[in-house]
């Protein structure tokens, strides 16, 4: 063993000696501290007394070829102010069954008294082919210092363990502005060993090494500190997040480890906990799940088999005044995304996104459960609710999105969106259940109701929107899309506003105007359409209010009319729902019930009938005006089935009377020429009068349809019996003028 340079004076620098080369058997060598092939150790530099001294540790010896142990390299012990040093390198392991040398065990830079010191941990030794282990890096403990953890050793090729990464803190900086990075783990073995080096695991069934466990930057006292967490292991390593507790500090959570290829579990990433004013942070990402049955991580992506997805960054994005943050990504299986909780004045935040459902039968993740923006103390805060998770493909349930609860004066918020339903038989997600804008203390607040979730192909239902603010303006929720089978469409609830003089949509009381909610679209099969806005179109307690009822659903929905109880108000009843495509009945529109003096109202419109044999909707059932001197109009009846009228007219064409009328029309048109508008007008008039005389029960519309069909039949007969010469395609406009003039003369 060669002795190193012992520099004891101020500013001295020394390098450890190299050990000698030993014999080929078991002797110990020297020469600059390189150990023998047996078990030699290299001595490090002991620059112990002077300020500003720098030194490097010795290199460990080469291990023996038989069963010897590799040497250890001693680190630099720099105990003075501002000193910097690097740990020693571990020795090479033996080729047989011996252990690989440990890395520099000494401190990288133990500059305990002064600021600004920097140091790096030692590198672990190369493992042997049997079971060698890598070294550990030591931390830097000085004020304001920056340090990096040591690198783990390379694992063995057989069943040995890979080296552990730098276990010490990357930079335990207690002063202002300190920054540091955690250590990297060692590379794992190719067989079943445990991994290290950034947490890369083994290729077989071994467990991945742990990543940098120390905090990226624990800048606990001052502002502006930044740090990043360590990388997790491949198997089950965890990445430690940045714990930035100082004012204005920014930090990012650690990344979880990559899951194993067998059955390992993915790591979970811790979020950034920024508790001071104005701080911003992002939650950590979970680890990637295993390909077999392991649990996932990394942004919450789940396993490909049946494992559960890892949880996303659960910590709050930012809990400070005016701070903004985003929740973590939920897991693919059942992970939840935590929303941003901004509890200070005027803060803005967005809720987390729900997790993706599993591919088997797992449940879809819940949307951001935290409040989008809980701006409880100040005015003008804005926030958006979380988005619901995607449902599973099997039988899982879609997620729910929590709305924004803005309780401050004049606050504005939007409700969350409901989750997508699954493809099997699960239920579609409910829309944002929270209030659109619960601005209970001040006037003028605005908010929008939530959108109902898309129904599944089974029986999903849409959500409802509620708006309860004083003087606020809010819109009711939109009903969900109905299912394709027999499910029911969602209901859209109107806005129930209890204050006066508010202006907006959906049932604002007072002098304002409101509109009812929209009903859901009905199903394509035989399901029932959603009900229209059930809330009052305009429940006005004052004079002059105006409102419109909600639109009914596609199947058999009903539109609730405007229930106006005020004096002098003008209201219109609701519109009936669109009939179903099969045999559904059109909706009924409730009329306007105006109970005050001098009020004027119009009845509701009936629904459109079905395309098949459905009935047309009934007109406005309510009273047009129940007051003295009032003027009102009755409701309009529904439009009947157009298809049934046309089919009936076509069936009458085969009667002998119709054939006689067509023959007479052919004779008149041929004798008068093709461009004689007077002859065409006379022919149409004669056919209409003859049909009406022979069919006294037909309506005027039915007679007109029958006459036009017979005139078209006559024209086809003329074309089929003629020799058609050159056709002037450019004079089609002249023909349309002739037909229009003839119809006007015959029926006008």
Curated annotation (Swiss-Prot):
Q: Give the domain section of the comments.
A: Highly repetitive protein characterized by regions of polyalanine and glycine-rich repeating units.
According to UniProt, the name of this protein is Spidroin-1
Lineage of source species: Eukaryota, Metazoa, Ecdysozoa, Arthropoda, Chelicerata
sequence repeat locations: 1-25, 26-38, 39-66, 67-96, 97-130, 131-158, 159-191, 192-204, 205-235, 236-262, 263-292, 293-305, 306-333, 334-360, 361-394, 395-424, 425-458, 459-485, 486-512, 513-525, 526-555, 556-582, 583-612, 613-642, 643-655
UniProt record similarity statement? Belongs to the silk fibroin family.
Where is it chiefly localized?
secreted
Q: Where is this region: 25 X approximate tandem repeats?
A: 1-655
Listed A to Z, the keywords are:
Repeat, Secreted, Silk protein
**Out of the domains of life, which is the source?**
Eukaryota
Extract the InterPro entries matched here: Spidroin_C (IPR021001), Spidroin_C_sf (IPR038542)
């Amino acid at each position: 063993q060669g002795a190193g340079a012992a520099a004891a004076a101020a500013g001295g620098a020394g390098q450890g000696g190299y050990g000698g080369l030993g014999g080929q058997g078991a002797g110990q060598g020297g020469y600059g501290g390189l150990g023998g092939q047996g078990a030699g150790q290299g001595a490090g530099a002991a620059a112990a007394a002077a300020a500003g001294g720098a030194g490097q540790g010795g290199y460990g010896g080469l291990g023996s070829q038989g069963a010897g142990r590799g040497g250890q390299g001693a680190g630099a012990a720099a105990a003075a102010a501002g000193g910097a040093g690097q740990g020693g390198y571990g020795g090479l392991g033996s080729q047989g069954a011996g252990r690989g040398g440990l890395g520099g065990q000494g401190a990288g830079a133990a500059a305990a008294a002064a600021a600004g010191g920097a140091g790096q941990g030692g590198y672990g030794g190369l493992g042997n082919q049997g079971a060698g282990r890598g070294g550990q890096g030591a931390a830097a403990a000085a004020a304001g210092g920056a340090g990096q953890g040591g690198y783990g050793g390379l694992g063995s090729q057989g069943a040995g363990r890979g080296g552990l990464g730098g276990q010490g803190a990357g930079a335990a900086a207690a002063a202002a502005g300190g920054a540091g990075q955690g250590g990297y783990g060692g590379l794992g073995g190719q067989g079943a060993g445990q991994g290290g080096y950034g947490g890369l695991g083994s290729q077989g069934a071994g467990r991945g090494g742990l990543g940098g466990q120390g905090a990226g930057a624990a800048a606990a006292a001052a502002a502006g500190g930044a740090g990043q967490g360590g990388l997790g292991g491949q198997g089950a390593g965890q990445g430690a997040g940045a714990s930035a507790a100082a004012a204005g500090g920014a930090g990012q959570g650690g990344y979880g480890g990559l899951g194993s290829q067998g059955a390992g579990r993915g790591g979970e990433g811790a979020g950034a906990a920024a508790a001071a004013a104005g701080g911003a942070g992002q939650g950590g990402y979970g680890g990637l799940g295993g390909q077999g049955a392991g649990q996932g991580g990394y942004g919450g992506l789940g396993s490909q088999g049946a494992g559960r997805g890892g949880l996303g960054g659960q910590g709050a994005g930012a809990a400070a005044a005016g701070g903004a943050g985003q929740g973590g990504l939920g897991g693919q299986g059942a992970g939840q995304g935590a929303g941003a909780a901004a509890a200070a004045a005027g803060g803005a935040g967005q809720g987390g996104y729900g997790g993706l459902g599993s591919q088997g039968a797992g449940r879809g993740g819940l949307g951001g459960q935290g409040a989008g923006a809980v701006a409880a103390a100040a005015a003008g805060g804005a926030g958006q609710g979380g988005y619901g998770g995607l449902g599973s493909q099997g039988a899982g349930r879609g997620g729910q999105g929590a709305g924004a609860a803005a309780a401050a004066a004049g606050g504005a918020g939007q409700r969350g969106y409901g989750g997508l339903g699954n493809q099997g038989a699960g239920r579609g997600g409910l829309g944002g259940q929270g209030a659109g804008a619960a601005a209970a203390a001040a006037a003028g607040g605005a908010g929008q109701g939530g959108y109902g979730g898309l129904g599944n192909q089974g029986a999903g239902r849409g959500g409802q929107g509620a708006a309860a603010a004083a003087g606020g303006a809010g819109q009711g929720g939109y009903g969900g899309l109905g299912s394709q089978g027999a499910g029911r469409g969602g209901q859209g609830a109107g806005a129930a506003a209890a204050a006066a003089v508010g202006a907006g949509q959906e049932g604002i009381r007072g002098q304002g105007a409101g509109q009812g909610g929209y009903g859901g679209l009905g199903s394509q099969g035989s399901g029932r359409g959603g009900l229209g806005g059930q809330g009052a179109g305009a429940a006005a307690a004052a004079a002059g209010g105006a409102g419109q009822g909600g639109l009914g659903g596609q199947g058999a929905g009903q539109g609730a009319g405007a229930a106006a109880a005020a004096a002098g108000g003008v209201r219109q009843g609701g519109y009936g729902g669109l009939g179903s495509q099969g045999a559904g009945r059109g909706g009924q529109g409730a009329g306007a019930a105006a109970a005050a003096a001098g009020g004027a109202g119009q009845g509701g419109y009936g629904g459109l009938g079905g395309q098949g044999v459905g009935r047309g909707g009934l007109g406005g059932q309510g009273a047009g005006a129940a007051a003295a001197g009032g003027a009102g109009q009755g409701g309009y009846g529904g439009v009947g089935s157009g298809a049934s009228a046309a089919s009936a007219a076509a069936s009458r064409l085969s009667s002998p009377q119709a054939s006689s009328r067509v023959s007479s029309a052919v004779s008149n048109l041929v004798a008068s020429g093709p461009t004689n508008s007077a002859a065409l007008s006379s022919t149409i008039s004669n056919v209409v009068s003859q049909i009406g005389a022979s069919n006294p029960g037909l309506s005027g519309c039915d007679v007109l349809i029958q006459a036009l069909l017979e005139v078209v039949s006559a024209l086809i007969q003329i074309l089929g019996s003629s020799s058609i010469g050159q056709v002037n395609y450019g004079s089609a406009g002249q023909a349309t003028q002739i037909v229009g003039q003839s119809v006007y003369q015959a029926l006008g």
